[in-house]
A protein has these predicted regions:
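Terminal substrate-recognition subdomain of acyl/acetyltransferases
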Residues: 2-15, 108, 120-178
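Short Gly/charged-rich anion-binding patches and loops
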Residues: 22, 102, 121
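Short loop segments at secondary-structure junctions
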Residues: 53-56, 89, 159-163
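Short acidic (Asp/Glu) patches
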Residues: 64-66, 99-103, 137-142
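A short, internal acetyl-CoA/4′-phosphopantetheine-binding micro-motif in the GNAT/acyltransferase core
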Residues: 81-91, 121
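Conserved acetyl-CoA pyrophosphate-binding loop and the N-cap/start of the following alpha-helix
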Residues: 89-102
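Conserved GNAT acetyl-CoA-binding A-motif
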Residues: 105-119
């Protein structure tokens, strides 16, 4: 049985309060309540990819927001992928792949590279889309200057061939930096 779905991309500013509430509720459902308001805030202000069924119910979501990384003396514009989730009863049906394809199109057209912090459950999807685990050092450039983060889980990158001999320093933010 094939289910008809529609994929839509839209900036946060173009989503209705009802659409945003549905996406937020999907995060709570998919992450079993382990998706904080801070996590949600990180996914706002960029482009969202939303997959709906024929009745208009939201099945999958992801967003890409702009951030900056310093690498090897350059400041790079990053499409940072956030809030990727599929309704639990619809996982493993290609919906996450639709979301990632749409977000990767945005990254390819608007950014120097894509970066994300994978969940254990999502890593297989990202690898299938060509995302690679960063093997170099990571850190942040924040209010206190450069802070190395040797215990940080490695992010994944897409669309750029960066030298892991040089640290990947991402802009600081509240909550999880990566």
């Amino acid at each position: 049985m094939t289910t008809v779905t529609t994929l839509r991309t839209a900036h946060t500013a173009d989503l209705t309060p009802t659409e945003l509430a549905a996406a937020r509720a999907l995060m709570d459902l998919a992450f079993d309540g382990d998706f904080s308001d801070e996590d949600w805030d990180h996914g706002l202000g960029g482009v969202h990819a939303l997959v709906h069924d024929a009745e208009g119910e939201l099945l999958a979501h992801g967003s890409v927001v702009q951030r900056r990384v310093l690498h090897n003396g350059r400041s790079l514009r990053v499409g940072y992928v956030e809030a990727v989730a599929t309704r639990p009863d619809r996982q493993r049906q290609g919906l996450g792949g639709q979301v990632m394809g749409a977000l990767e199109d945005v990254v390819e057209r608007a950014y120097d590279l894509g970066v994300l912090s994978p969940s254990e459950e999502g890593e297989k999807l990202y690898r299938a889309h060509g995302w690679q685990t960063w093997t170099g050092l990571v850190g942040t450039l924040g209010p206190q200057g450069v802070t190395e983060m040797p215990d940080e889980d490695a992010p994944m990158i897409w669309g750029a061939d960066l030298d892991p001999a040089h640290a990947l320093l991402i802009d600081w933010r509240d909550g999880d930096v990566f």
